[in-house]
Amino acid sequence: HTAVLAKGVSSIMGTTSSASTSGRLSPFAALRYRDFRLLWLGQLVSTAGTQMRIVAVNVQVYELAKRGGAIDPALALGLIGLARAVPLVATALLSGLVADRADRRLLLLLTSIGALISSAVLAAASGLVVTPLWLVYAMVILAAVVGAFEMPARQALVPTLVPPEILPNALSLNIIAWQLATIAGPTLAGLLIAWAGVAPVYWI
């Protein structure tokens, strides 16, 4: 009985010690892991770029619709929102399945290439005398599809980069990265568009 009691006390003390250690984790503990740090920085830059592109597309579509006169500018902006939302909903189940079964690093690479193609086409098109609205919508749809696959792949990769006890911290840092990018992206886009137009935003 004494041995069992001692074992139980030891187990409790070990659990308490572990919890205490966990409670003293640095707010940036997950960033000590190189692979997660690279993923986190990539997410910060990628999300900021996405937010910048959203602002640039909205400005470009509004100006094109206003100049062309074939469609009301407010309606044109509403259709942009639809072009972003429909692919996200349509691919929701498929993107989750692919993220679970595919090589997540390869999937992130492919989605990055897709996003680059979308931005490059928009940047090149913005230099045309008349940019077709349909082309802008097509690239918005491509970017939305890419984003639908990128998000679950990135989330599924996180648990493989840090120990289980660090995972809550890693997820919290991901939220912080998203919030920072959501604030900084539109601000930078607005400043850059006011200074040099929409094309430079697409190239960033």
Q: What function would you assign to each model-found segment?
A:
Residues 5-204:
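Alpha-helical transmembrane-bundle signature of multi-pass membrane transport and export proteins
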